[in-house]
Amino acid sequence: MQLTSLGFLFVLLPVGGLIYYFLRGAGRRRFLLWYSLLFVGLLSPLCLLLLLAVMVPDYLLARYIAMAHPRARSILLGCVIKDISLAVVCSILTELDKLILPVGISIAAFTSVGYLIDLYHGECDPIDDPIRYGVFCSFFGKLYIGPIVSAQQFVPQLDDPQMTAEGITRGMVQHLRGLAKIVILAGSLQELITQWETLLSLEVTILGTWLHVLCYIFYIYSVSYTHLRAHETVLDL
């Protein structure tokens, strides 16, 4: 399921927004966690397993880092190596066409790594509640392609969400702008990039290479998942 698919736009997102709106307190946080895990599971059961492999060990070991355990540095290093290795292996397998990219694994991994490093340096408070930690790592509004946010930025929003009619309207406008860019620009640019890569495989020139790079940069911008994420974040937080 993609952020631009009909199932996400007209079923998963609006239904989730309505349920979240009528819930209160801890019920909202629990719902966000299970809904985010559902989103990942619909993408791929493998994605869900990899996501849990990132979150569960890091949550359990974070308490030792927060308590300044004598082996806190070693624990932190082990978690960092585990998360980065998982993200790198997934990327390599994807490049080799051995695996469809597990959406959100890299985002979740680096989100968790950032939290553990901040915790080790005393720059944030430990997230004792597993529900809060789970939402922090797996919230579907940012899991697809970021952004990577710190615990100091994200967790307070779970305790004091600001969901207003004005924010929802602004988010819907952002989402429509993002969809328009994807439909109008991204498809054409992707076809152009594919044709350009074929030409470059026959004859490589400096001008052709730079034009290909610029075209690809503009394609990444025109995909506009940032606009889509902004909309979902306004709706849910």
Model-derived segments and their meaning:
Residues 1-235:
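Membrane-embedded transmembrane alpha-helical bundles that form the catalytic cores
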